[in-house]
Amino acid sequence: RALPSGQVSIRSYWAFLIASSILFVFSAWMLNPLAFYLSSVALVIVFFYSLTKRFTAFSHFWLGLAISIAPVGAWVAIREEISFISLLLGAAVVFWLIGFDILYSCMDVDADRVNRLHSIPQRFGVEMALKVAWVSHAVMVVFLLILLESMVLLGPVYLAGVVLVAGLLIY
């Protein structure tokens, strides 16, 4: 990590953060009004994530929300609307990321304890965390199956992909 190790100065960090944020909001403004209005919400969600591990075991949920901005944001950029389909796709991403991040956190449970960082494996144990990850991935598969009707043009290719992903997660 560049900032804690001193490879990047705090001044450089803030300059990059401010410049990136301005570029993000400007880019959203260039896309369409809805993207522009939602850009500040997206920034708050993304900025707040890095703090969540310091005070809640449910930081995995916040990370899922932050990453789900990408598919919903792409939808807003292209279609200039938020639809049920885009929210369902975003929800699938939320639950995929929750499960994935919990699995990843199981490998870091000891480091989380030492550094007093919060995670589901650190708070509830690895066994319970694995169950939460499984449920999260199952919810994701359900959302992807609900999307099947909307992805009618993809038909069997989409369904095969969902079945393959579900099979890999079960394996």
Regions found by a protein language model. Name each.
Residues I85-W96, L153-G161:
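Alpha-helical transmembrane segments
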Residues V46-S50, A92-Y104, V163-L169:
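Alpha-helical transmembrane segments of multi-pass membrane proteins
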Residues I98-L117:
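Membrane-embedded alpha-helices of multi-pass transport/permease systems
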Residues R1-S39, V114-V165:
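Multi-pass membrane catalytic core of lipid/isoprenoid biosynthesis enzymes
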Residues A2-L88, Y171:
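Intramembrane alpha-helical segments
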Residues P33-L34, F55, E80-E81, C106, ...:
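Membrane-interface elements of multi-pass transporters and channels
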